[in-house]
């Protein structure tokens, strides 16, 4: 809301201007109560962004408390820019995932690019050097021209920013479903490396210490971005384009280097990214955490546009900006470091004893608000919850095994589904080798980055099958955690912890809140069983377009530790003659499956079942087998079932595979039962592997590039290269065809 003349406090009240900023009548009354007076325009702007769901988690806080957040590896849990876990030898890894869904729906290139930039700043604000980027993306039906436009420009935005800033984009996931046609999801994850002694916090301690502004100038882009991210997308969505920020990755690169050098200086007290809610959130949160206040002179804020008001400066979400608190008397030393990198470093205020955020503009106090009122005293809502009618209907359904009349044609059709097909079209646009530490590039179950000058590596992944979560939020939430851990273990790593991005519809609808609550219950249970605490994350609610919500999509970003290079494992067959094992039990479970979507065009019925103790044990024995040197390749069996996992095992290798199926073929190939791995083992170790894991030997890797399935009543034989052409060509074909 950009006005030439700002409304008076009386107009704000009488014309309910606060409601256009996302505040309810009750919330406005609470602001008046906290201040002891009616707020002016700048002040109500501060409250509107800080009390948005995006900043305050006012609708999700009671739910988030269910997550386990501590563990043997956790050095920093939720509450700072990113979580941090210990990896031994005084070293640690910081990581976090965040959403940029609403901006990407309006301006896909900049929305995605600035999502990447923001998550990078969260990582280096902790003192960590960013070493890898991942993402999790959701789009609608790829036959639609608007969806193609969004998909293409989001991928370009991620690539454009990540490639220019010099951080490898090494992994992620992309899924397509009509549920996301009006509301795409763009979740960005960053991983950073740090030594224990360099860990920083966003805190404003020490009365008289200086508050310094570092980085790019402030413009009018992104004003009310946090509020925009906390409401449904309506018919007027395109008019919200000014709420989308504009990024500069080259400025970000300079900011990374400047801040990582400043962090080594003893005069630095605290540092925080000016992310959602810009100067408002960074100043209020840093002061509140320290039990202090901040006074800022807004005349000193570097501006790239003329005539900016306090309201605009405080609510701007211009990118590539950081707020520092520096010990008094050392400002010149910090400025010297920052200006060496060609950036602004300007004292704009200082820490004060009074616990207020005081903003001075042109010699007058433009706003004065208690910092706790902004940061800690935001209202928290316990929303009503109601089981949706669709869920009860699905639960009442009897499980049905689909009929497949043409097995070979159906198999190819599954491989050509955009959610299952190769994502090479996506990741070949990303520079995944910059920094030259990428050991396992996109395409395997998890990416692997080596830690230089050590034997250690990090495995990382993002995962969520939202169709399962829609069918049964509690089970689907647990499966999201379990599948992420499965991908980490299949890469030879021990899962350490996770970060989550909870993408849901409106919590104001009791059925929507029930989905959120149940999904978190399931995730929390899986986290406890698998010993993967939640160290941070993001909540993105109101993902609805014209009243239609997305599937509940709790994306899990997970990192694991590989102790030795010989433990690194990929999902690709290595040599002919290796024995192919299937770990885990296959049941007739087709609810939410690729086959169900292919045949019915929608999901229904029951989500796959999940026995968490069995999941834990299966992962444990596989990781042990990998560390014992018995495994040549390991692949999680997930979406598409064995029909996807089996050919993926040999795609790009020149090998084939010959397996025997002695159960129902449709179930064996297309069921999406959980807790399963495909594993290849040198035949010399096959007996030992079978004893250790109770795995079932189903076939061998062959020299001939042929996929052979021997069933009791038929023989299926297909050319691997032909299947690979179908799998590799699907997304490029969609993107070059006319809608």
Curated annotation (Swiss-Prot):
<feature type="binding site">
    <location>
        <position position="96"/>
    </location>
    <ligand>
        <name>ATP</name>
    </ligand>
</feature>
<dbReference type="InterPro" id="IPR041609">
    <property type="entry name" value="PurL_linker"/>
</dbReference>
<keyword id="KW-0436">Ligase</keyword>
<feature type="binding site">
    <location>
        <position position="537"/>
    </location>
    <ligand>
        <name>ATP</name>
    </ligand>
</feature>
<keyword id="KW-0963">Cytoplasm</keyword>
<dbReference type="InterPro" id="IPR010918">
    <property type="entry name" value="PurM-like_C_dom"/>
</dbReference>
<dbReference type="Pfam" id="PF02769">
    <property type="entry name" value="AIRS_C"/>
</dbReference>
<keyword id="KW-0067">ATP-binding</keyword>
<feature type="binding site">
    <location>
        <begin position="99"/>
        <end position="102"/>
    </location>
    <ligand>
        <name>substrate</name>
    </ligand>
</feature>
<feature type="binding site">
    <location>
        <position position="273"/>
    </location>
    <ligand>
        <name>Mg(2+) 2</name>
    </ligand>
</feature>
<feature type="active site">
    <location>
        <position position="54"/>
    </location>
</feature>
<dbReference type="InterPro" id="IPR016188">
    <property type="entry name" value="PurM-like_N"/>
</dbReference>
<feature type="active site" description="Proton acceptor">
    <location>
        <position position="100"/>
    </location>
</feature>
<dbReference type="Pfam" id="PF18072">
    <property type="entry name" value="FGAR-AT_linker"/>
</dbReference>
<comment type="subunit">
    <text>Monomer. Part of the FGAM synthase complex composed of 1 PurL, 1 PurQ and 2 PurS subunits.</text>
</comment>
<dbReference type="GO" id="GO:0000287">
    <property type="term" value="F:magnesium ion binding"/>
</dbReference>
<feature type="binding site">
    <location>
        <position position="500"/>
    </location>
    <ligand>
        <name>ATP</name>
    </ligand>
</feature>
<dbReference type="GO" id="GO:0006189">
    <property type="term" value="P:'de novo' IMP biosynthetic process"/>
</dbReference>
<dbReference type="InterPro" id="IPR010074">
    <property type="entry name" value="PRibForGlyAmidine_synth_PurL"/>
</dbReference>
<feature type="binding site">
    <location>
        <position position="57"/>
    </location>
    <ligand>
        <name>ATP</name>
    </ligand>
</feature>
<feature type="binding site">
    <location>
        <position position="122"/>
    </location>
    <ligand>
        <name>Mg(2+) 2</name>
    </ligand>
</feature>
<comment type="similarity">
    <text>Belongs to the FGAMS family.</text>
</comment>
<dbReference type="GO" id="GO:0005524">
    <property type="term" value="F:ATP binding"/>
</dbReference>
<dbReference type="InterPro" id="IPR036676">
    <property type="entry name" value="PurM-like_C_sf"/>
</dbReference>
<dbReference type="GO" id="GO:0005737">
    <property type="term" value="C:cytoplasm"/>
</dbReference>
<keyword id="KW-0479">Metal-binding</keyword>
<feature type="binding site">
    <location>
        <position position="98"/>
    </location>
    <ligand>
        <name>Mg(2+) 1</name>
    </ligand>
</feature>
<feature type="binding site">
    <location>
        <position position="121"/>
    </location>
    <ligand>
        <name>substrate</name>
    </ligand>
</feature>
<feature type="binding site">
    <location>
        <position position="540"/>
    </location>
    <ligand>
        <name>substrate</name>
    </ligand>
</feature>
<dbReference type="InterPro" id="IPR036921">
    <property type="entry name" value="PurM-like_N_sf"/>
</dbReference>
<dbReference type="GO" id="GO:0004642">
    <property type="term" value="F:phosphoribosylformylglycinamidine synthase activity"/>
</dbReference>
<feature type="binding site">
    <location>
        <begin position="317"/>
        <end position="319"/>
    </location>
    <ligand>
        <name>substrate</name>
    </ligand>
</feature>
<keyword id="KW-0460">Magnesium</keyword>
<keyword id="KW-0547">Nucleotide-binding</keyword>
<comment type="function">
    <text>Part of the phosphoribosylformylglycinamidine synthase complex involved in the purines biosynthetic pathway. Catalyzes the ATP-dependent conversion of formylglycinamide ribonucleotide (FGAR) and glutamine to yield formylglycinamidine ribonucleotide (FGAM) and glutamate. The FGAM synthase complex is composed of three subunits. PurQ produces an ammonia molecule by converting glutamine to glutamate. PurL transfers the ammonia molecule to FGAR to form FGAM in an ATP-dependent manner.</text>
</comment>
<dbReference type="Pfam" id="PF00586">
    <property type="entry name" value="AIRS"/>
</dbReference>
<feature type="binding site">
    <location>
        <position position="538"/>
    </location>
    <ligand>
        <name>Mg(2+) 1</name>
    </ligand>
</feature>
<protein>
    <recommendedName>
        <fullName>Phosphoribosylformylglycinamidine synthase subunit PurL</fullName>
        <ecNumber>6.3.5.3</ecNumber>
    </recommendedName>
</protein>
<comment type="pathway">
    <text>Purine metabolism; IMP biosynthesis via de novo pathway; 5-amino-1-(5-phospho-D-ribosyl)imidazole from N(2)-formyl-N(1)-(5-phospho-D-ribosyl)glycinamide: step 1/2.</text>
</comment>
<keyword id="KW-0658">Purine biosynthesis</keyword>
<feature type="binding site">
    <location>
        <position position="245"/>
    </location>
    <ligand>
        <name>substrate</name>
    </ligand>
</feature>
């Amino acid at each position: 809301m950009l006005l030439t003349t700002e409304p008076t406090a009386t107009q704000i009240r009488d014309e309910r201007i606060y409601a256009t900023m996302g505040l309810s009548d009750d919330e406005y009354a609470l602001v008046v109560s906290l201040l002891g007076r009616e707020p002016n325009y700048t002040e109500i702007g501060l409250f509107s962004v800080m009390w948005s769901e995006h900043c305050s988690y006012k609708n999700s806080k009671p739910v988030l408390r269910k997550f386990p957040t501590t563990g043997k590896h956790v050095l920093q849990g939720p509450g700072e820019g990113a979580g941090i876990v210990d990896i031994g030898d005084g070293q640690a890894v910081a990581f976090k995932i965040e959403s940029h869904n609403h901006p990407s729906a309006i301006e896909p290139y900049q929305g995605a690019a600035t999502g990447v930039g923001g998550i990078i700043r969260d990582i280096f604000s902790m003192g960590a050097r960013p070493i890898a980027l991942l993402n999790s993306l959701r789009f609608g039906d790829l036959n639609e021209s608007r969806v193609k436009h969004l998909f293409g420009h989001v991928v370009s935005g991620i690539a454009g920013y990540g490639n220019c800033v010099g951080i490898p984009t090494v992994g992620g996931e992309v899924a397509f479903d009509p549920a996301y046609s009006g509301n795409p999801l763009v979740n960005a994850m960053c991983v950073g490396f740090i030594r224990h002694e360099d860990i920083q916090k966003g805190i404003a301690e020490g009365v008289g210490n200086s508050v310094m502004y570092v980085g790019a100038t402030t413009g009018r882009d992104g004003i009310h971005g946090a509020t925009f991210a906390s409401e449904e997308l309506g018919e007027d969505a395109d008019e919200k384009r000014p709420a989308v920020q504009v990024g500069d990755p080259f400025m970000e690169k300079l900011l990374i280097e400047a801040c990582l050098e400043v962090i080594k200086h003893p005069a630095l007290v605290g540092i925080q990214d000016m992310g959602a809610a810009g100067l408002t959130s960074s100043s209020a949160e840093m002061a509140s955490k320290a039990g202090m206040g901040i006074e800022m002179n807004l005349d000193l804020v570097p501006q790239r546009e003329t005539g900016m008001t306090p309201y605009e400066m405080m609510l701007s979400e211009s990118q590539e900006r950081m707020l520092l608190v520096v010990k008094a008397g050392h400002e010149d030393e910090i400025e010297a470091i920052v200006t060496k990198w060609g950036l602004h470093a300007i004292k704009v205020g200082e820490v004060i004893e009074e616990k207020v955020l005081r903003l001075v503009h042109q010699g007058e106090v433009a706003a004065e608000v208690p910092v706790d009122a902004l940061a800690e005293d935001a209202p928290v809502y316990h929303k009503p919850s109601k089981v949706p009618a669709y869920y009860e209907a699905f639960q009442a359904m009897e499980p049905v095994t689909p009929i497949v009349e043409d097995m070979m044609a159906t198999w190819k059709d599954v491989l050509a589904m955009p959610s299952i097909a190769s994502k090479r079209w996506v990741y070949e646009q990303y520079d995944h080798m910059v920094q030259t530490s990428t050991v396992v590039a996109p395409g395997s179950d998890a990416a692997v980055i080596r830690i230089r000058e050590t034997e250690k590596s990090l495995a990382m992944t993002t995962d969520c099958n939202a169709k399962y979560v829609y069918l049964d939020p509690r089970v689907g939430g647990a499966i999201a955690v379990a599948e992420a851990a499965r991908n980490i273990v299949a890469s030879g790593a021990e899962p350490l912890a996770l970060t989550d991005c909870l993408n849901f519809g409106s919590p104001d609808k009791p059925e929507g809140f029930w989905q959120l609550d149940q999904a978190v219950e399931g995730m929390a249970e899986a986290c406890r069983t698998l010993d993967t605490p939640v160290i941070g994350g993001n909540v993105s609610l109101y993902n609805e377009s014209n009243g239609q919500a997305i599937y509940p999509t709790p994306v899990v970003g997970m990192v694991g530790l590989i102790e030795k290079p010989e433990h690194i494992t990929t999902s690709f067959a290595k040599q002919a003659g290796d024995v192919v094992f299937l770990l885990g039990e296959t049941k007739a479970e087709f609810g939410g499956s690729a086959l169900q979507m292919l045949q019915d065009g929608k999901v229904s019925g029951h989500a796959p079942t999940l026995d968490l103790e069995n999941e834990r044990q299966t992962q444990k024995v596989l990781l042990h087998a990998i560390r014992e040197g018995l495994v040549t390749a390991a692949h999680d069996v997930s979406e598409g079932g064995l029909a996807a996992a089996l050919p993926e095992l040999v795609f790009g290798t020149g090998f084939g595979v010959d397996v025997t199926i002695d159960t129902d073929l449709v179930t064996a190939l297309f069921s999406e039962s959980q807790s399963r791995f495909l594993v290849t083992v040198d035949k010399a170790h096959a007996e030992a592997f079978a004893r250790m894991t109770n795995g079932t030997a189903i076939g061998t890797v062959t020299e001939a590039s042929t996929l052979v399935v021997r069933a009791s009543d038929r023989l299926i034989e297909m050319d691997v290269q032909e299947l690979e052409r179908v799998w590799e060509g699907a997304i490029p074909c969609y993107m070059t065809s006319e809608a």
